[in-house]
A protein has these predicted regions:
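Acidic/His- and Gly-rich active-site-bordering loop/insert found
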Residues: 2-111, 120-123, 127-137
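Acidic, glycine-rich active-site loops and adjacent beta-strand->loop/helix elements
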Residues: 89-91, 116, 142-147
């Protein structure tokens, strides 16, 4: 059951629910293809492509070597207001022991700390913000390599 605060944002949740399966697929793909800090080449490409498909206003890559930054301007971007949202993309050097179809395909490396989920959630935020633009200011979406 959603809290009253979340119910007030029912339109946002309904909108995001429309592309939730795509976010799950992205998270599972990233989980299956973990990369260590500052080696997130595949992850960076996937993020860049997802942001392009979302329709963000700007995409900057190679930030901190493998990081990606997306920029979305709201309906009133001239206000000078700006917010940054961040997700970390790197994996850990540990062996995955589950047997899910999306388990790590790389021996001794896995997303054991949720960074695949953080990345997918920030892509979801980027898509929602780009599709609705129902905010005042600019949102900067930072996909950080090497936490």
């Amino acid at each position: 059951m959603l809290s009253p605060r979340f119910k007030a944002n029912g339109r946002a949740f309904a909108h995001i629910a429309g592309f939730h399966p795509e976010l799950v697929a992205l998270r599972r793909d990233l989980h299956a293809h973990p990369e260590l800090g500052f080696e997130e080449l595949y992850t960076g490409r996937r993020v860049k492509e997802a942001l392009r498909l979302c329709g963000v206003d700007e995409i900057h890559e190679g930030i901190g070597k493998t990081g990606v930054v997306g920029v979305v301007r709201g309906r009133k971007s001239s206000s000078g207001k700006m917010i940054g949202l961040r997700a970390d993309m790197d994996a850990l050097t540990m062996t995955e022991s589950n047997d899910f179809p999306w388990r790590s395909t790389k021996a001794g490396m896995m997303h054991g700390c949720g960074h695949d989920g953080h990345t997918a959630m920030l892509v979801g935020a980027a898509r929602y913000l780009a599709e609705t633009r129902n905010f005042d200011g600019t949102a900067v979406l930072i996909f950080q390599p090497g936490e």
